[in-house]
From Swiss-Prot:
Identification of the protein by name: E1B 55 kDa protein
UniProt-reported outcome of changing Y444A: Decreased ability to promote ubiquitination and degradation of host MRE11, without affecting ability to promote ubiquitination and degradation of host TP53
Post-translational modification as stated in the protein's UniProt record: Phosphorylation at the C-terminus affects the subcellular location.
Superkingdom per UniProt: Viruses
An example Gene Ontology molecular-function term: SUMO ligase activity
Residue numbers spanned by region Disordered: 1-74
Family per record: Belongs to the adenoviridae E1B 55 kDa protein family.
Oligomer status and interactors: Interacts with host PML-4 and PML-5; this interaction promotes efficient subnuclear targeting of E1B-55K to PML nuclear bodies. Interacts with E4-ORF3 protein. Interacts with E4-ORF6 protein.
Subcellular locations according to the entry: Host nucleus; Host cytoplasm
Highest classification ranks of the organism: Viruses, Varidnaviria, Bamfordvirae, Preplasmiviricota, Tectiliviricetes
Gene Ontology CC: one annotated term: host cell nucleus
Annotated function: Plays a major role to prevent cellular inhibition of viral genome replication. Assembles an SCF-like E3 ubiquitin ligase complex based on the cellular proteins ELOB, ELOC, CUL5 and RBX1, in cooperation with viral E4orf6. This viral RING-type ligase ubiquitinates cellular substrates and targets them to proteasomal degradation: TP53/p53, LIG4, MRE11-RAD50-NBS1 (MRN) complex, ITGA3, DAXX and BLM. E1B-55K probably acts as the substrate-specific adapter of the SCF-like E3 ubiquitin ligase complex.
Length: 496
């Protein structure tokens, strides 16, 4: 991983010059097109135009624009094709006439590659206040007191631009501050152990994970390293992770982990598994099995994230704060096994009227996972549930200590399922309740059983519940409790 001296000005590695950034696709000649004519139309003008076009192409001149007879609107076929791009596939064929082909899109792959190369060249040649490398900082630390002192900031640390053939683990260990090129695609073929603080900026680059290991990135306990201001723990931002052939966990964090603007596409296992402090902000999870798993005694902050078509978005076994997120078409957006704070989220259920077929056995009983599932716990309090919008969702409420009091939540077309002991512990005076339905479980029918997969990884037998509609028993009487009371507005900052 030879790296040029950052003090030397010039073109970075991988670029022969600024002119080489221009894509070579512009020099390629686009296939000529001729006007589609009905059979039998052998006019002299058409033959002359075809002969003239072939002579001009043979002479190396620019191909002449083919002529055509005017249509009913007074315009020829070429003008119609220019005004209506959707007709180009019918009005244009290849020069050899072997079949219909559509016109290339306005933005091709070559133009996208050229834009990415221009962006990479601009980022790599930009002037920054970088004055010292991570190795020099380690050499300057003679004793343990120097290791604890934060003499430099992340802005002063020299950036290493990772090439597709470089070793991720070695680059993180040696340079700590690593950047990825947006015009390159990276591949992880083995486990990456991270044992020091690092700052990885992806710049929108794609990283494909293709390894048979159980974990792709293991963030282990951090050793004694020099302190750099702004680089606390493992920080990864603006990276797109894909793994069509990977069946393990992407991130296994045993130390502080910050994921900022990271995207996960199509992982059939856990994306982030945290055993300690983790902050996930501005990330996107598309078609993943499990998004964020917070293990016991962990503290997680998940905010401004997007969960789309995930089987299980968030699994909370520790202390979690989930705020300002959006979920769409997820089997279960959040499974709460411990304490949690759920505020300012927008959750849209499945467009199709089908329930999730996955179970949870967290409290010793098997229940179908709902969009937001609060499992029973004899010693835990209810989660804080405020300012959330639920549309076409289902909410499962187990038995807990205290009273579940959702505050200013919109439960639009939402079904609430109450376990037998939790009906008297739910207060719905502060929600928008016109289209909600509340069901209470009376008993479980042991004669009607189904074997379903569970979120723990196994399969269990579930007894079919016998339920009763208790919507009107728990819905507040709005003729007595007016909507102008303090539950829907106050004199503080929440005033309308």
């Amino acid at each position: 991983m030879e790296r040029r001296n950052p003090s030397e000005r010039g073109v970075p590695a991988g670029f022969s010059g600024h002119a080489s950034v221009e894509s070579g696709c512009e020099t390629q000649e686009s296939p000529a097109t001729v006007v589609f004519r009905p059979p039998g139309d052998n006019t002299d003008g058409g033959a002359a135009a075809a002969a003239g076009g072939s002579q001009a192409a043979a002479a190396g001149a620019e191909p002449m624009e083919p002529e055509s007879r005017p249509g009913p609107s007074g315009m020829n076929v070429v003008q119609v094709a220019e005004l209506y791009p959707e007709l180009r596939r019918i009005l244009t064929i290849t020069e050899d006439g072997q079949g219909l082909k559509g016109v290339k899109r306005e933005r091709g792959a070559c133009e996208a590659t050229e834009e990415a190369r221009n962006l990479a060249f601009s980022l790599m040649t930009r002037h920054r206040p970088e004055c010292i490398t991570f190795q020099q900082i380690k050499d300057n630390c003679a004793n343990e007191l120097d290791l604890l002192a934060q003499k430099y900031s992340i802005e002063q640390l020299t950036t290493y631009w990772l090439q597709p053939g470089d070793d991720f683990e070695e680059a993180i260990r040696v340079y700590a501050k690593v950047a990825l090129r947006p015009d390159c695609k990276y591949k992880i073929s083995k486990l990456v152990n991270i044992r020091n603080c690092c700052y990885i900026s992806g710049n929108g680059a794609e990283v494909e994970i293709d390894t048979e290991d159980r974990v792709a990135f293991r963030c282990s306990m951090i050793n004694m390293w020099p302190g750099v201001l702004g680089m606390d723990g493992v920080v990864i931002m603006n990276v797109r992770f894909t793994g069509p052939n990977f069946s393990g966990t992407v991130f296994l964090a045993n130390t502080n982990l910050i994921l900022h603007g990271v995207s996960f596409y199509g992982f059939n296992n856990t994306c982030v598994e945290a055993w300690t402090d983790v902050r996930v902000r501005g990330c996107a999870f598309y078609c993943c099995w499990k998004g964020v798993v917070c293990r016991p005694k962990s503290r997680a902050s998940i905010k401004k994230c997007l969960f789309e078509r995930c089987t299980l978005g968030i699994l909370s076994e520790g202390n979690s704060r989930v705020r300002h997120n959006v979920a769409s078409d997820c089997g279960c957006f959040m499974l709460v096994k411990s304490v949690a704070v759920i505020k300012h989220n927008m959750v849209c259920g499945n467009c199709e009227d089908r329930a999730s077929q996955m179970l949870t056995c967290s409290d010793g009983n098997c229940h179908l996972l709902k969009t937001i599932h609060v499992a029973s716990h004899s010693r835990k309090a209810w989660p804080v549930f405020e300012h959330n919008i639920l549309t076409r969702c289902s909410l499962h409420l187990g038995n807990r200590r205290g009273v579940f009091l959702p505050y200013q939540c919109n439960l639009s077309h939402t079904k609430i399922l109450l376990e037998p002991e939790s009906m008297s512990k739910v207060n719905l005076n502060g929600v928008f309740d016109m289209t909600m339905k509340i069901w209470k479980v009376l008993r479980y029918d042991e004669t009607r059983t189904r074997c379903r997969p569970c979120e723990c990884g196994g399969k269990h037998i579930r007894n079919q519940p016998v339920m009763l509609d208790v919507t009107e028993e728990l819905r507040p009487d709005h003729l007595v409790l007016a909507c102008t009371r303090a539950e829907f507005g106050s004199s503080d900052e929440d005033t309308d």
